[in-house]
A protein has these predicted regions:
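Non-catalytic cell-wall polysaccharide-engagement segments
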Residues: 1-129
Length: 129
């Protein structure tokens, strides 16, 4: 976390994360909610896909959602099936597939429901314009 923020020219003691802790750095960064250790795994691919040099910024929406698309694809969502997309959402959230855990499965179901609503109400109506 400290290296990411400092490389971006920020102050790690002032940078907002989702769950600040009184000691250390807890919580996820930016709109896509990546933890620092996961973000660094994707830095090179994010930069390459965006055509940028240097470190991508987890607080920049374009960088954050490119990272999400890469990560969700790696988690299996790129196959495009309901089950694969739902499991990828669960893995993004918890590191595990949608299983018997009602909390994790509920999260995956909510993600798929919202994605379906966005597809039907915002994307499909634009087709053929």
């Amino acid at each position: 976390f400290m290296n990411i923020v400092r490389t971006l020219g920020g102050d790690p003691f002032k940078q907002v994360v989702s769950c600040p802790q009184s000691v250390g750095w807890g919580g996820a960064m930016g709109p896509a909610q990546f933890i620092a250790s996961t973000w660094v795994l994707f830095e090179d691919r994010i930069s390459s896909n965006l055509g940028i040099s240097g470190i991508p910024d987890p607080w920049n929406p374009a960088h954050a959602f490119m990272a999400s698309s890469i990560y969700l694809g790696d988690l299996g969502a790129s196959s495009g099936t309901y089950s694969a997309e739902r499991n990828a959402a669960c893995k993004y959230y918890s590191g595990r597939s949608c299983s018997a855990s009602s909390l994790i499965a509920s999260y995956g179901n909510q993600v798929i429901s919202r994605a379906d609503t966005i597809q039907r109400t915002m994307i499909d109506p634009l087709q053929g314009l």
